[in-house]
């Protein structure tokens, strides 16, 4: 078969017309060095600060240093097989994590990937890990309580929904225990919880997850994990990921509680990244923006007003305020609260619960030091009955501390001083509480009422805990309706006062402790 020139030219024109060229513009770069999880890239002219950079093998790095002739990026995950000359691409996206109710009851890593072996995570979409905190106009004052279940905290250092309350102390003083008990106490409160574990041993985290499951609190909690064996980048980003997951509930008119355990390790991970990126070191070798590291995280914990929620949900949720309450944990060295990171976080938060190793070792647990622990905004949120009955507790403890110091040097004490010392010791004993045993508002009120109204005066110090246990058992058995009424209303009036007095009088008459 012979084709003439006209047919050939027509065929060529037809093929040219059918030829479809798809052009894609990629912003590509080349790795010029790999060192301790930090890669230097040449050629990414249009990269953004914080942008995800696609690496070979379905991995990502985050651009942190934008320099004149190169980009410094931190690899999220293993980097041993990365080498000079490899090609990388800009993605045009910043880091996002899955958010939604499907994450409740799950254990995930910094990127929101499940690590509990329960299959894929169901989510309602993705949210950027770095978000701007709500402005002043979008906020509402804190006036609803978060009950931790600890008498000493709820009575003297109350926490409100939308507050940032620092938990600070040396290692092994019960910081994590306090935070975990606060999460366990939210089982029936409707508050969703997020627990962020940074730089801890995997065995410790597994134990925490098991305890949450045992006490029925895991179904209400998201656990975000960046263990000590993971890269500094994942440890640095874990609190931001957890915060994004908590903000999902805040922005939809619900209440959430987030625990950062702990921010000291996050600061150390960020210091490591900054030094490897050759950023100039400052005090304690931390970079200059370590304050901003924590302030931009903790400012996202807030109580937002109904207008903000309605606007965010496009009118789907009306008349509801949302909140995200933060309990950041900081570990001190030998009780030094004036170190760089502790002072930073103290100045950012709305108060601190200071746990002392000397109190912990003396058997006073939770080891709260009421002298330097404070809640700056929680007073307005405190339950009415607890607020009324706890007024004299802090004063009694402060006087007891002062007199106890002087009584070591004085041989003979007058009756009034001896009485104050005795009352202070009994209040200290009454505020002791076992782990994983949070108390309801009614139970706390009953204990505080007994101390406030002098029912402990004729009880021996060694018998105070037995007295309280027997009192609560008696109240549950004989006056369950009164406890239920106090738990539901949280109010305090002459009628409730009379009922509490009658309850304690009848219990004292039984002498059964």
Curated annotation (Swiss-Prot):
The record marks 373 as: Required for activity. One of its GO terms (molecular function) is ATP binding. One of its GO terms (cellular component) is proton-transporting ATP synthase complex. SUPFAM superfamilies: C-terminal domain of alpha and beta subunits of F1 ATP synthase (SSF47917), N-terminal domain of alpha and beta subunits of F1 ATP synthase (SSF50615), P-loop containing nucleoside triphosphate hydrolases (SSF52540). Keywords: ATP synthesis, ATP-binding, Cell inner membrane, Cell membrane, CF(1), Hydrogen ion transport, Ion transport, Membrane, Nucleotide-binding, Translocase, Transport. It comes from the Bacteria. InterPro entries: ATP_synth_asu-like_sf, ATP_synth_asu_C, ATP_synth_asu_C_sf, ATP_synth_F1_a_nt-bd_dom, ATP_synth_F1_asu, ATPase_a/bsu_AS, ATPase_F1/V1/A1_a/bsu_N, ATPase_F1/V1/A1_a/bsu_N_sf. It holds the Pfam family ATP-synt_ab_N. It catalyses: ATP + H2O + 4 H(+)(in) = ADP + phosphate + 5 H(+)(out). CDD domains: ATP-synt_F1_alpha_C, ATP-synt_F1_alpha_N, F1-ATPase_alpha_CD. It is found in: Cell inner membrane. It is a peripheral membrane protein. Its EC number is 7.1.2.2. ATP binds at residues 169-176. Produces ATP from ADP in the presence of a proton gradient across the membrane. The alpha chain is a regulatory subunit. F-type ATPases have 2 components, CF(1) - the catalytic core - and CF(0) - the membrane proton channel. CF(1) has five subunits: alpha(3), beta(3), gamma(1), delta(1), epsilon(1). CF(0) has three main subunits: a(1), b(2) and c(9-12). The alpha and beta chains form an alternating ring which encloses part of the gamma chain. CF(1) is attached to CF(0) by a central stalk formed by the gamma and epsilon chains, while a peripheral stalk is formed by the delta and b chains. Belongs to the ATPase alpha/beta chains family. HAMAP family: ATP_synth_alpha_bact (MF_01346). NCBIfam families: atpA (TIGR00962), PRK13343.1 (NF009884). This is ATP synthase subunit alpha.
